[in-house]
Amino acid sequence: MFSIKPGPRKLPIDNPSLLSWNITDGDLNSKLNTLEYLNCVTNIINACGVYPQDLKDREIISTFHAEKVINDLLKNDYKISLSPDTTYRELNKAAQRSITAPDRIGEGKIWVYQRDTMVERGDNSGVHQYGPAEHFTHIISDKPSPKDKYVAYAINIPDYELAADVYNINVTSPSGQQETFKILINPEHLRQTLERKSLTAVQKSQCEIITPKKPGEAILHAFNATYQQIRENMSEFARCHYGYIQIPPVTTFRADGPETPEEEKGYWFHAYQPEDLCTIHNPMGDLQDFIALVKDAKKFGIDIIPDYTFNFMGIGGSGKNDLDYPSADIRAKISKDIEGGIPGYWQGQVLIPFTIDPVTKERKQIHPEDIHLTAKDFEASKDNISKDEWENLHALKEKRLNGMPKTPPKSDQVIMLQNQYVREMRKYGVRGLRYDAAKHSKHEQIERSITPPLKNYNERLHNTNLFNPKYHEKAVMNYMEYLVTCQLDEEQMSSLLYERDDLSAIDFSLLMKTIKAFSFGGDLQTLASKPSSTISSIPSKRRILININHDFPNNGNLFNDFLFNHQQDEQLAMAYMAALPFSRPLVYWDGQVLKSTTEIKNYDGSTRVGGEAWLNKGCSTYQQLYNEFHALYIDKAGIWSAFEGVFATKNVLAFSRGDSVNINHSPHDGLVIINKGNEEVEGAWPNKLQPGKYKNMGSNSVNIIINNTRKIIPPGKAFMLRGGTLNINIPGRSALLLGKTGEPLNYLYL
């Protein structure tokens, strides 16, 4: 049992008439004022989290009490500032319980349970419904779990409390004293509650809420990583300027199904072979792990983008033969667990709680142990795509891939589940999806499966008043993987992007062009932005740029043409991609949960691609700096390339960046120089720099020469320039990304 004594903290109490609270904790009975109560709540959260093992203690830190506390403080003329506590990571799964079903508490040691009741209907039939339970009521002694004698509790947490999180609450007294506490709140519900109170306009003006800024716009592909792995590294991802994290498909899948050949068990590709969309349970985590991940990411301003497999189903179980999904063995395990007294866990993994018939509008509840797809929901053909059919678009769209049953656009059940899947993802705060293997889908299927389109959403500004929120419009990050290997592919993808202006796409054509330019004998000038031509057929604001993805190293030699010849070329290419306006780079990381290829070597034993580049969580020093440059310049349209001189050769590409850049050599505030050759290059950049504070965001130290004095600027180093023409020395096999970050005092001018 923990103690809720106030502790030694010096509290900013100006008004002794603040609301008092009667608190009971074991043998301790205390009457505390509001700020002492906040101190107790802070101690509980620090020691036990928001879900203490003794469930009755959860009442002490409920959002209901938190809202009363904040109302009390505002009425007594205290100032309040609320901000997400990024140091707090909830480990107890009850905090992420589905809003429609129960879940377990205490890291799998205690189970939450809602009674299964029969609701009678007029035709004398009935439907099972997980009815409301009392809030933290009694132990159900006749429902022990078969595992370790778990105990089942009856519990019901309101939706608004499920969406609550731990916030720092900075309290300033009327005399100016300050203290910071922890509190559990749902900001939107707090606003709605306080609007009904008799607060004055002045009192309302004293409550601000700080929303985290997006740390960048780059995308991290957290391939083959658990949701927990990603959560543990969230602060590092924010530090490295990632604004989005693409994660493995959020479905039910397994890597060791009974129909899976022994030699294929444990491999990464099972993540892309779903066996159920309605229930979330896989080697990366379950629904509660996923909800916790989205919550943690939001604290840092990062959006989660799940991979979405919408056109095939998996082959690990009997479903590949009888086309009943989930497969029989999955349904049997769930039923056995439920009958064994632990229904709360599986019902807690239901992402899609019900479907709505498009004609009758009747709601049908989803149960995890039921069949959700049958033979009528799949293409009739059971033929596999053969090796010589990879450029046959008809075969790609009609046939199976590696034996996986193909879903058609005609199945109302498939479309209904897919649309509901997207809606449920939005409810949990997902602001984008990455649509896998779109090349294998007919346009009609993409049109029906990716609906209704959500093009934009309102995001709260960084620092606003709780009662007068201000928003800015953000575009949803929906993008597709449409593998382009020929001109017909290019035309098909362009047509699809024209039809759906809410979709972006991975730019495979630009990747191939970049690989060729960085290869031995290749010409970097083919990547230069010129007034009369474009570097890609995909509009710049809808381009996702990659230098590697999960498919290329993990399919034998099938995608060797999409691999760079050397790891350093791969890194330099990323510098180029991060420097382009409007587009977003996607950085690959292999979390190695399932078997995969993490390094490809040349014949001489040197690393061709991969190795450290794929295993450092996308957080190498150079990648952090690339992402920082990208965040500074993504929305600045200006780009001007040198077309002659030492910085415009087959081995050297250079261009200015910034809003003021144009063909008339206006002063600029960003400079990119990439030298793929082995020899250093020295010269004067013809476009003048604006005066100000600059930072080397490139991969290597560079020499800047002013008045015959050579200054070495290492990566990450900030320095001041008075402006004008820049004389610079670029080492071989390196990239310079020079960005203006401001003009503060106390920096030495070069």
Curated annotation (Swiss-Prot):
In its UniProt record, a GO molecular function of this protein is:
cation binding
Q: Which InterPro entries match?
A: A-amylase/branching_C, Glyco_hydro_13_cat_dom, Glyco_hydro_b, Glycoside_hydrolase_SF
Provide the GO biological process annotations: carbohydrate metabolic process
Record's PANTHER family? ALPHA-AMYLASE
Recorded protein name is Putative uncharacterized protein YgaQ
Lineage of the native species?
Bacteria, Pseudomonadati, Pseudomonadota, Gammaproteobacteria, Enterobacterales
